[in-house]
Design a protein with these regions (language model features):
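In a subset of proteins, long, contiguous C-terminal domains/tails are tracked
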Residues: 199-200, 208
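Non-catalytic signal-transmission and effector/linker regions of two-component phosphorelay proteins
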Residues: 1-3, 52-58, 62-141, 148-149, ...
Length: 208
């Protein structure tokens, strides 16, 4: 199939016949250069042993909510289009910083649903179908970062267009403390943008 036609995204389960899923992802990327390959799993044991990389771009958890499929498509679309849309259309950006696969797999469908509903309400009844589609495409883009370096990279690149940051209290922090990574990121984001809206989420009461 990959050789016969063009694909924009591959979503695969952890088991692809007898082939290892990472080997499958690598093979797919050899057929179509730059093809995003996302793995979807519901097996807790599998999730504990698998990591992104080597053919797999992201890993999501299947919880029974079918909206995760649309959210994966929208996230990959946002990641691919954000640079051009910010440059050409001054589109806004929302940053989600979370390394828990189970949490961001549950969070993203909620976030995208609210974002699309709000955009639809703002459009109202006016305008033709073409105008409404253009407005939907101009909705805020959501970017997912799972460690400190990638979060800072998004802030550095799109700080003028970020309208909000949702951050966990703990996540991988290269060269720093994992337990206080969220607070470090908040300080970093507000250094040049004091009033940037940030929602800090943590189960650790000591960080509140």
């Amino acid at each position: 199939l990959l050789s016969a036609r063009e694909f924009d995204l591959v979503i695969t389960m952890a088991r692809v016949g007898e082939m290892d899923v990472k080997a499958f992802g690598t093979e797919a990327k050899l057929v179509i250069e730059g093809l995003p390959v996302v793995m979807l799993s519901h097996n807790t044991r599998e999730l504990a042993t698998l990591s992104a990389g080597d053919g797999i771009d992201r890993i999501f958890v299947w919880t029974g909510d079918s909206r995760i499929l649309l959210s994966i498509c929208k996230l990959i679309e946002d990641e691919r289009n954000v640079e051009n849309d910010v440059r050409d259309g001054d589109v806004q950006v929302i940053l989600l910083v979370e390394d828990s696969r189970r949490f961001y797999s549950a969070y993203l469908p909620l976030l995208y649903t609210q974002l699309v509903n709000q955009t639809t309400r703002l459009m109202g009844e006016g305008g033709n179908l073409h105008e409404k589609l253009l407005r939907l495409r101009a909705r805020a883009k959501i970017l997912l970062a799972s460690d400190m370096n990638s979060a800072k990279s998004v802030i550095d690149r799109y700080h003028n267009n970020i309208i909000g940051i949702f951050t966990d209290g703990k996540f991988p922090n290269q060269g720093g403390q994992r337990d206080t990574a969220g607070l470090e990121l908040v300080r970093y984001a507000q250094e040049g943008h004091r009033y940037m809206p940030i929602l800090f989420q943590s189960k650790n009461l000591e960080l509140k």
